[in-house]
Amino acid sequence: MDIFDSTITSFEDFPSERFKEQLESLTYESIERASQFVLENLPCIDDLFDVLLNRMRKSAYHKRLLFFNLIDCICIGCSRIENDVYKKFIINNVDEIIPLILPDDNLEVKKKNRETIERIIRSWSNNHVFNDTFISRAFSILSGVAKESRSICPNLSEKEIARLLKRMEEKRKDQNKKRLDLEDSHPLDEFLELWFNFNLDNSSSSSSSSSSSSSSSSTTTTTTTTSELSSISTSLNSIRTNSSCSNNNLQIDIEIIEKEKEKQKEHFNSFNDTSITTPSTSSSTTSSSSSSSSSSSSSSSSSSSSSSSSSSSSSSSSSSSSSSSSSSLDNSTTNDNNNNTSNNKNNNNDNYNNQSILEKERIYKLDYEVYDSFKSQFTIPEWPSYEIEDIDLFTSGNDGEYQDYIENEYNSFDQNSYLEYKKKYKNNEFENSIGNSNNYYNRNSSNNNNNNNNNNNNNNNNNNNNNNNNNNNNNNNEDSGNFMNSILNYCFYEHKNHFNFIKNNRNNHYPYNTSGYLNNRVDNYQPYSPKTTSDSHKLQEYFNKIDYMNKNGISVVDICAKSKSFEIPNICGADGGDSDRMDIDTNNSLKNENKQNDSHRGKSRKRRSSSRGESEHSRYYRDSSRDAKDRDSRDHRDNRDHRDSRDHRDRRDSRDHRDSRDYRDHRDSRDYRDSRDSRDSRDSRDRESRDSRDHRESRDSRDHRESRDSREYRESRDHRDHSRDSRDQYRDKDHRDSSDGRDHRNRDDKYQIDKRDNQHHNERNDSRNDRNDKNDKNDKNDKNDKNQEKYSERYHNERDSRDNEKDFYRSKETMVNNDNRSSSNRSSNRH
């Protein structure tokens, strides 16, 4: 490096930097010059080789062979001068240099490059540039590269690897988009599995707790009811878990059902023994007799009649009034009238109980989870007629008072008054009300099973039970996953039977509007009028709408799942009113219901304490009339408030509309005024420009006319002067002839005066002409300036366009030159 110390003055003077510049513009013609530069700088040949190898790594395939030819020239030049400094670098990096030249994606180029490399290596061996060991190693590397690729995937080219990576990236994006595939799975699968395992593990403990609770049921009526409900629920859970574990198709073991029915019968009998003695205390329990009455189907006719009579006494005093308990009550009264009809009733009861148990046993883990997920969206009522607790789609918001009224209505009647009303009631209508629910629960059974329901033999009843079990098992696949639908339909029909009983027995004393039970909105809540029959048809109209939904396959669950409120189509049109709308708001309904329940409990206590000496009927009539008055006044006040708010809203809307209309008119007028002003200003500006142009033209014409007049005047003056001069000459001649000195002097004076006047007049005309010429010149200069600006702008535009054209043609020429140069290079390479 000492050789270059005296010549290097800056960083750009280093050989490596200068060699980089040569490699950037390297061609086949400049290979010899670049190799000569390396030979001149042999002390730093390692740095120059490093620069060359880096350039090969970064360059494209079609340029790498050019760099290899440069290496060949350098090696041959060094061998000629017998300098071995090149061997060390080439021997150490030959494993990388040769594979860099062979492309993977183009077989033709790869074949040509391989032939060129083989020719260069043979020339090295012929000229003794490298020894034989290096030559054999180079050939082995060349043959190895021909068989294997230098890339990551040995069997793929670089383009194929790029395509593979692109496909992998697309698949990764698709997987990110499809993280949750909901087509073949349920969102609650994991929780369902945990819930199922938990119930499976705790089935034994729950059954033991149910047995202990059933043993303690004989102490008090309240504990009996809760223990019975817990035993029934745990037994149903055990049946559900056993059936779901044993068979995926949810087939139910009949023996397990019979065992559970016997257990329910024992609990039911024990409950009836206590409830007969204390009918008033059992009125505080809810939803117990309905589930217990379903267990009395497997006994004989005498035992079933006794159990049904006991159940009638208990259910009349209790607050629950499900279809099963209603059927048992009906059987007790018909036994007093006709023994033959009681056998048919028992058969119907057995079939009904079996069907209700089968409906319960169809509940499996997914249905229970769907039920639990829907529970939180609705109001949790204390409705006595439900066999299935903690669900109600009817009562929410303002209907809590109506619900409390119905509960107190049942609690306020004793057994005797109930039986008196029952005797007045027609048996056929009562049978029809129960028959609706029986027909509904027997909808999946065949015609043969329905015919067998009317038989009087217990053996036929057992066979019918078995047939119903088989039919329901066969239909499990059709109705799987529709547990919520069955529950809601069950509740609808229970409500229908319940309100048919109330409507037909107490229509004259019914203080509330049935539409209030259906509509939660205060503005739609109308007071009840017993004189008209329109209100009595509204409940039946509502249930007709529900029947229409069931017949046409409209799922109430789907409607409730999609939105918190749903509308049922108005198909009956008894009153010609609007369709009933049910708004379900969980938080508000729960708050309102709790407040109303608390307030109503206090009122009911006061009523009981104040009316102990009165009869149940008088207390009911007085309380109902008082409640009706309160309800009417409150409804009137609510309607008035609603009407006032609606009027206020209408006035506000009209005021807003008027303000918006005024603002729009004002805006339009302002825009019109602005446009008119702008148009007037534009017209005035045009008029001024036109006036200025006319003034300029008139001035030019006036100046031209004045100049013409002045020229004519000048010509006439010259002519007059000439005539005067000629006359003066004759006069002078006469004067000379007359030799009169006085005339000669007078003539000279006159001539001087005329000359002075003419001179003054000429000066004035000249000044005027000069002024006119000056004005003309100024106008001409203004026009010239404008034209010059216009021409200069046009000139600049033309010049820019010419420059762009020159650049375009220059770039085109360079492209053509480059193409010609590349073609010449290719032709030289071929030669």
From Swiss-Prot:
Region described as Disordered: 205-233, 265-354, 434-480, 572-831
UniProt feature, compositional bias: Basic and acidic residues: 592-601, 611-813
Composition bias type Low complexity, residue spans: 272-354, 434-477, 817-831
InterPro entries referenced in this protein's UniProt entry, alphabetically: CID_dom, ENTH_VHS, Nuc_rcpt_coact/corep
Domain of life: Eukaryota
Residue ranges of domain CID in the record: 1-146
SUPFAM superfamilies membership: ENTH/VHS domain (SSF48464)
Signal peptide positions on this chain: none
Any matching Pfam family: CID
Name used for this protein in its record: Putative uncharacterized protein DDB_G0281733
Organism in which the protein naturally occurs: Dictyostelium discoideum (Social amoeba)
